[in-house]
């Protein structure tokens, strides 16, 4: 029974002090009451710990104030101004968007970055809601690929490399993809360490993509959701430099 297996999986995660946050996409024309009902169902029936919501018509104000969802972590790209102005705090509500990602990448990779904007991103925090900061997430390059590829390489997805974002602000440090050149590998290492330092020294909540701590690569694919193979899998094997990165 699929339902029973999923519930068992989530319970097992909880027993091991891990949480399950679902990424859910809703179409523009989706009924807002249906969205609320769906979130309540997953929160109460499956006991998921939160939701990363994607879509332009998500009723985020109603979700933030819903009694059934007050214990669920809610991640969304935009928080309405009226919530910012309320005296009530929303400790379960988090701003999740690409502002930090683009600001950090532009500055680190010398692609038109702004120290002023980076400073604002580093110190942004609010008593009403939280902020999530990241340089890589599940919808783009891995952290290792961010400094190994100037261009996306999504040919294996079967869409002639037209899928996935073209705005990556990535850098290959001198060679596209894998290399044995020591100076290129050292430059990539420095960039990666600086990226992690930026995220973890910021005041917001740091997010680290699974596998980035092991230098996982998707071979330059920045839209690998359809790759149920070595491209899309997280490689937990010992990579050169992995132990040094984790020690860092």
Where are the regions a protein language model picked out?
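Aromatic- and acidic-residue-enriched segments that line the glycan-binding/catalytic groove
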Residues: 1, 26-33, 87-93, 220-230
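Acidic/Ser/Thr/Pro-rich low-complexity tail/linker regions in eukaryotic proteins
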Residues: 169-170, 232, 244
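Acidic/aromatic-lined carbohydrate-recognition and catalytic surfaces
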Residues: 1-36, 40-82
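The substrate-binding groove and active-site-proximal loops of carbohydrate-active enzymes
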Residues: 1-3, 26-33, 47-56, 107, ...
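Catalytic cores of secreted or luminal carbohydrate-active enzymes
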Residues: 240-248
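Generic alpha-helical structural signal
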Residues: 7, 36, 193, 246-247
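Compositionally biased, low-complexity linear motifs
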Residues: 152-157, 221-241
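Conserved alpha/beta catalytic core and glycan-binding cleft of carbohydrate-active enzymes
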Residues: 47, 59-210, 214-215, 223-225
């Amino acid at each position: 029974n699929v339902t029973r297996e999923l519930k068992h999986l989530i319970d097992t995660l909880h027993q091991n002090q891990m949480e399950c946050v679902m990424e859910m996409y809703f179409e523009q024309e989706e009924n807002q009451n249906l969205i609320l009902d769906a979130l309540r169902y997953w929160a109460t029936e499956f006991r998921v710990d939160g939701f990363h919501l994607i879509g332009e018509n998500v009723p985020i104000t109603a979700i933030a104030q819903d009694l059934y969802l007050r214990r669920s972590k809610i991640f969304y790209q935009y928080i309405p101004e009226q919530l910012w102005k309320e005296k009530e705090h929303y400790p379960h509500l988090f701003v999740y968007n690409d502002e930090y990602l683009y600001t950090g990448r532009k500055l680190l990779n010398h692609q038109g970055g702004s120290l002023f904007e980076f400073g604002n991103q580093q110190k942004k925090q609010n008593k009403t809601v939280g902020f999530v900061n990241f340089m890589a997430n599940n919808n783009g390059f891995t952290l290792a690929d961010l400094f190994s590829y100037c261009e996306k390489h999504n040919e294996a997805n079967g869409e002639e490399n037209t899928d996935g974002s073209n705005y990556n602000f990535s850098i290959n440090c001198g060679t596209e993809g894998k290399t044995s050149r020591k100076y290129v590998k050292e430059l990539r290492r420095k960039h990666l360490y600086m990226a992690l330092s930026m995220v973890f020294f910021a005041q917001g909540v740091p997010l680290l993509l699974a596998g980035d701590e092991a230098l996982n690569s998707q071979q330059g694919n920045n839209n690998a959701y359809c790759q149920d193979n070595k491209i899309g899998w997280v490689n937990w094997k010992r990579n050169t430099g992995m132990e040094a990165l984790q020690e860092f």
